[in-house]
Amino acid sequence: EMAGGAYPVICLMPNTPVAVGAGVVQYYGVDTTEEELSDFQTLLSAAGMIDRIDPERLNAASAVSGCGPAFCAVFIEALADGGVACGLPRDKALAYAAKMVEGTAQLMLENHAHPGQLKDGVCSPGGTTIQGVRTLEDRGFRSAVIEAVIAAYEKTIALGK
């Protein structure tokens, strides 16, 4: 209204990994044509995954993929800290942790595998990995991640009011 007419608008939420072509951008159009939205998607394709989303889901998507890089960075840092505590040099621990996250994500996406399936494929009965997973579960790792996403979502809603 302030602009004096109806103009096409594309609302989007990119995340920081778009800087290296491995990001996620959710978007929706207001007063846009399918051709404009298609052109937009083509224009941004080098940024990573470009996903058209219902407007009412943008805040939830932002909590997962917009805030997710920070959550993932905390996980990578903690994993590296554990490696340092076990005797690895910091630079190697960080490199191993980051590459492991990248590779696990790639494996999941390329094989269309559920994360639980990948976890189960690494956990040998009575082995080291299942003991680590047990510790993560005992310490509330899964719940902490879920609550972090919900907190980010709720803050996004509050900021929009």
Give residue ranges: language-model regions.
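Short pre-catalytic strand/loop immediately N-terminal to key active-site residues, enriched for Gly-Thr
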Residues: 9, 58-63, 115-120
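A short acidic, helix-capping loop that chelates divalent metal ions and anchors anionic groups
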Residues: 19-23, 60-62, 131
